[in-house]
Regions:
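Sec-dependent N-terminal signal peptides of Gram-positive bacterial secreted proteins and lipoproteins
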Residues: 2-27
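Domain-terminus/edge residues, biased toward the C-terminal soluble/receptor-binding domains
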Residues: 166-167, 178-183, 187-398
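Mixed-charge, polar/low-complexity N-terminal
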Residues: 7, 31-37, 41-43, 73-74, ...
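Structural motif marking the loop-to-transmembrane transition
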Residues: 3-4, 72, 123, 379-382, ...
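Active-site-adjacent loops and short helices of periplasmic peptidoglycan-processing enzymes
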Residues: 24-200
Length: 398
């Protein structure tokens, strides 16, 4: 395989008036690429609609009827979990907050964690009930806890779907139980699945195959994961299955191997075995096409930053964390590494964040990492001659 070439560009974009540097506010990995996918996967998925993608970049590897609307069944609960995880990570609720179950919670049919009226469970336990057992009662309990009623929660679900660009989705409830107009698409499900993956704590629950909750109960709650791939498919750690007579067998499945993550959404499979087979084969295909590459490692020297024209005064910009990207195997991609230093800093201490390093494939941003200074730079030293700094643009292979 031809060795990948990396182009290092040091960009110091400074207006002569020393106005603030303009940093990008939207990144390519926040949108799913809608380019035609390579559809040669070696088999024909039997589900009505599928999509396979690399979730970090959003690159679609394979799709079939990905924009056709179908009932999503309990895959709906991905949005329920997403809103819960956003509330947790925003600090509005905690995993140990108490949820008191209502009469409506007890009355929910279908998949259940057998919650009783007045029963008190933690947010974490309810999340487990949703992620593992696909509990309709757990989903309603979470909805009522967050918004006061399931109806109000459904409004929030639709608002979030709109924000995410899920243009072919409408939610009527938090559970996915059949309801008129409750529809989504494989592509939209992949969008909310990618968003949920930004809250990796959820994988601590969706990856569990069996769990027992016994505290405060005479009869323990036995949870068994409806997603059998977490037990039988190497690297699978989520996300959510679904089934109703209307929807048939659905899943949003994800797995990691060798630091590469795949996401496959299946809608309308004729059986749970076929659903799992389609998801497994698609992810196998994805893993055969993509690889993970480490660009920089934590605390490594990324770039020497000159402070004068001679270059005898400088500091070293070092990586705050590892920077790994997922790229297609066997391609001729030219990865561009760009180092951006904030020119407005007048004084820095050792360890201060001074900018960031980005990696691109063409115009597509694959990843970024913050950079910090290895030493103190006094105000009198920092960017002493702006014109000299502007002339320091590096372009070479490494």
């Amino acid at each position: 395989m031809k060795k990948n070439k990396f182009v290092l560009t040091l960009l110091l974009s400074v207006m002569l008036s020393l106005q603030a540097i303009i940093l990008p506010t939207a990144f390519a990995d926040d949108e799913i690429k809608n380019e035609p996918a390579d559809n040669v996967v070696g088999f024909e998925p039997q589900a009505k609609s599928v999509i396979l993608l690399e979730p970090n970049s959003g690159n679609v590897i394979y799709e079939k009827n990905a924009d056709e609307q179908f009932a999503p069944a309990s895959v709906t609960k991905i949005m329920t979990m997403l809103l819960a995880m956003e509330a947790i990570d925003d600090g509005r609720i905690t995993l140990q907050d108490k949820i008191v179950c209502s009469e409506k919670v007890k009355s929910m049919g279908g998949s259940s964690m057998i919650l009783d009226t007045g029963e008190v469970r933690t947010v974490e336990e309810i999340l487990k009930g949703i992620a593992i057992a696909s509990g309709n009662d757990a989903a309603v309990a979470m909805a009522e806890f967050l918004e006061g009623s399931e109806e109000a929660f459904a409004v929030k679900m639709n608002e979030r779907a709109k924000e995410l660009g899920m243009t072919n989705t409408h939610f009527e409830n938090s559970t996915g139980l059949s309801a008129s107009g409750h529809l989504s698409t494989a592509r939209d499900i992949s969008i909310m699945s990618r968003e949920l993956l930004k809250h990796p704590t959820i994988l601590n629950y969706s990856s569990i195959y069996m769990e027992t909750i016994s505290e405060g109960r005479k009869t323990p709650i036995e949870l068994v994961n409806h997603n059998k791939l977490v037990r039988f498919y190497k690297g699978c750690d989520g996300l959510k299955t679904g089934f109703t007579q209307e929807a048939m067998y659905c899943i949003s499945s994800t797995a990691t191997r060798d630091n590469v993550r795949m996401l496959a959404v299946i809608m309308g499979a004729p059986s749970f075995k076929q659903r799992n087979a389609d998801a497994s084969k698609l992810m196998d295909f994805g893993f055969s096409k993509y690889q993970s590459k480490t660009i920089v490692t934590k605390d490594c020297d990324v770039q020497q930053i000159p402070l004068n024209k001679k270059g005898d005064s400088f500091f070293i910009a070092k990586a705050k964390d590892d920077l790994k990207v997922t790229i297609e195997k066997g391609g001729e991609e030219e990865l561009t590494k760009k180092v951006n230093i904030n020119p407005e800093l007048k004084k820095i201490n050792a360890g201060d964040v001074v900018g960031y390093c980005e990696v691109y494939n063409g115009d597509e941003l694959l990843g970024k990492v913050e950079l910090y200074s290895d030493r103190e730079v006094k105000q009198s030293q920092f960017f002493k001659n702006i014109k000299d700094i502007l002339s320091n643009i590096f372009d070479h292979s490494i």
